[in-house]
Amino acid sequence: MRCLPVFVILLLLIASASSVDAQLKTKDDVPLTSVHDNAKGTQHRRIMAGCCPRFYQCCYPG
């Protein structure tokens, strides 16, 4: 029973600690938005490359 107050205090300290990023950023880290934009651009290029010459509506998605 003596350990219970210590355990509760430790839990409170852990919960109140400010969130810290455990991993430091390096120069190779890429923001997620950049990856998302690259994926959208790749998808658009694939659609444009598969454009059917007979029906030009399929060339422009959306």
Curated annotation (Swiss-Prot):
Main location (coarse class): secreted
Subcellular location: Secreted
Signal peptide: 1-22
Top-level taxon of the source organism: Eukaryota
Keyword Secreted listed: yes
Proline amide modified-residue sites: P61
Protein's name according to its UniProt entry: Conotoxin Sr5.6
Protein's organism: Conus spurius
